[in-house]
């Protein structure tokens, strides 16, 4: 509770300049298991945005990771990966390839990496930010046309990604409509994140020739994405998304607050947790991008999640979920991510027509069985 108060006060100071006087303070994350927040009105919001340009370079599970290229070790190069809640820098809505390049070169004002929390396990900050951005983007598309049939086309990830929204009659109350649009946007953004894990396992490569299999179904990934969806919805519902600039500054404030609420620890303690799992969840003797540097994966794709259980953690985990229903509307009846056959599907079987979230468990179960077989052969 002290951390919540502390970060509410810090948020007030951060956002009190006249430039951002339209922001209502304080910003407090809603980390109840099921979201409780509702909009009190239809707030001013961003105009229709460009889709996020790719994803931030995220972290393989572990720290001080060695790297190799074409099977040859890269000398004197290590990936630290560990960050702290109070050292995450700024947030920038990721609609430019320059942002990803800056992250790769280590010159970004954003700090991304992994940290450990008592209630949320390991959190990947890049995944939090990416799904927060996707939620804002989808809200900018969904809110102006809520209830109308539309298709939002995203870039390919093995499959053509189409977000199909169905026609329906929205609530008459404006605040209820606004709330429904925010939660529908977070619901769809999480489906986009879940598909990314599947696509990585089946051969998707952001950079051709560089396998991303090491990152597929990493134990912290989808809980981190879910956290990002929840935080973005919280900001939208509190009126903190009237512009990209306002959203960026609000994310800069809410993210550390949420991490402290989850029980974020120091970088030293995060590294200790990694050390305790070395040989079980990851293999410090392997190098990026070897797939089985990561030994533990979480193949569940639901948006009702607990953190992947840490054997040594006695503190209760925090379950988070997205609303499956709001104001009498079932989210699954309002829209879905459709994955149509793409130009290069690698190991992904071609769908009869398209995949949806209903197919995710079977695709993930196949991945789990294949990985288990390969790990058994390695022992």
For the regions a language model picked out, list residue spans one by one.
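Divalent metal-coordination and catalytic microenvironments
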Residues: 197, 221, 227
């Amino acid at each position: 509770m002290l951390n919540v108060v502390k970060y509410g006060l810090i948020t007030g100071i951060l956002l009190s300049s006249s430039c951002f006087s339209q922001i209502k303070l304080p910003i407090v994350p809603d980390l109840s298991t099921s979201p409780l927040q509702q909009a009190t009105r239809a707030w001013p919001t961003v105009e229709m945005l460009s889709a996020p340009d790719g994803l931030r370079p995220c972290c393989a599970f572990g720290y001080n990771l060695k790297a190799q290229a074409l099977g040859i070790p890269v000398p004197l190069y290590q990936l630290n990966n560990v960050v702290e809640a109070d050292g995450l820098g700024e947030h920038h809505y990721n609609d430019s390839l320059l942002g990803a390049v800056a992250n790769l070169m280590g010159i970004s004002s954003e700090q991304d990496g992994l940290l450990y929390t008592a209630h949320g396990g390991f959190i990947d900050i890049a995944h939090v930010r990416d799904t927060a951005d996707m939620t804002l983007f989808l809200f900018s598309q969904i809110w102006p046309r809520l209830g109308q049939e539309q298709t939002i086309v995203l870039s390919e990830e093995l499959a053509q990604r189409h977000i199909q929204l169905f026609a329906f009659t929205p609530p008459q109350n404006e605040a209820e409509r606004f709330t429904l649009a925010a939660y529908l946007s977070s619901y769809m953004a999480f489906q986009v994140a879940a598909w990314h894990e599947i696509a990585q396992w089946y051969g998707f490569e952001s950079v051709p020739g560089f396998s991303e299999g090491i990152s597929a179904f990493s134990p912290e990934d989808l809980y981190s994405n879910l956290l990002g969806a929840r935080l973005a919805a919280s900001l939208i519902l509190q009126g903190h998304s009237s512009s990209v600039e306002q959203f960026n500054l609000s994310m800069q404030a809410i993210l550390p607050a949420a991490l402290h609420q989850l029980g974020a620890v120091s970088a030293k303690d995060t590294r200790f947790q990694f050390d305790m799992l070395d040989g079980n969840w990851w293999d410090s003797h392997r190098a990026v991008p070897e797939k089985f540097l990561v030994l533990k994966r979480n193949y569940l794709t639901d948006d009702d999640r607990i953190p992947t259980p840490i054997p040594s953690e006695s503190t209760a985990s925090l379950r988070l979920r997205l609303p499956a229903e709001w104001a009498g509307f079932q989210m699954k009846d309002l829209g879905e991510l459709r994955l149509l056959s793409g130009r290069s599907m690698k190991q992904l079987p071609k769908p009869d027509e398209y995949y949806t979230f209903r197919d995710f468990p079977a695709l993930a179960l196949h991945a789990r069985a294949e990985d288990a077989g390969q790990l058994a052969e390695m022992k």
